[in-house]
Amino acid sequence: MLVVHVHARVRPERVADFLAATLANARESLAEPGVLRFDVIQDQADPAHVLLTEVYRDDDASAAHKATPHYAVWRDTVADMMAEPRQSVRYSVVFPVATEGWASESPWS
């Protein structure tokens, strides 16, 4: 199992646009078979800092996500909204190890 944290620093005047585009991408991502979670988290002290927490079944699922049309649309749409380049960190899950505990029921499916 793979967890990816993507830190996005958004231009303050584009936060609403970024969130709209990101929520559309998150909804599509949750329909992918290898995506277990896709959380969009906004910093309470700095609304222009958004954290994406993406949980994938494995590295192949992460690679498949990056090859989807909806990801390409999101990437291109938000490119000019960034205050600085996005930074991602990949993590291995130590606990819990069961993938069933990570899957979230999608309210959008």
Model-derived features: where do they sit?
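Short, well-ordered beta-strand segments in beta-rich or mixed alpha/beta enzyme
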Residues: 2-9, 39-66, 108
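Short, surface-exposed ligand-recognition loops at beta-strand->loop->(often short) alpha-helix junctions
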Residues: 10-18
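Short phosphate-engaging motifs
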Residues: 14, 48, 70
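An amphipathic, aromatic/His-enriched active-site/gating alpha helix that lines ligand/cofactor pockets
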Residues: 20, 24-36, 55-90
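Glycine-rich beta-strand-turn "strand-cap" elements at beta-sheet edges
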Residues: 40-48, 76-109
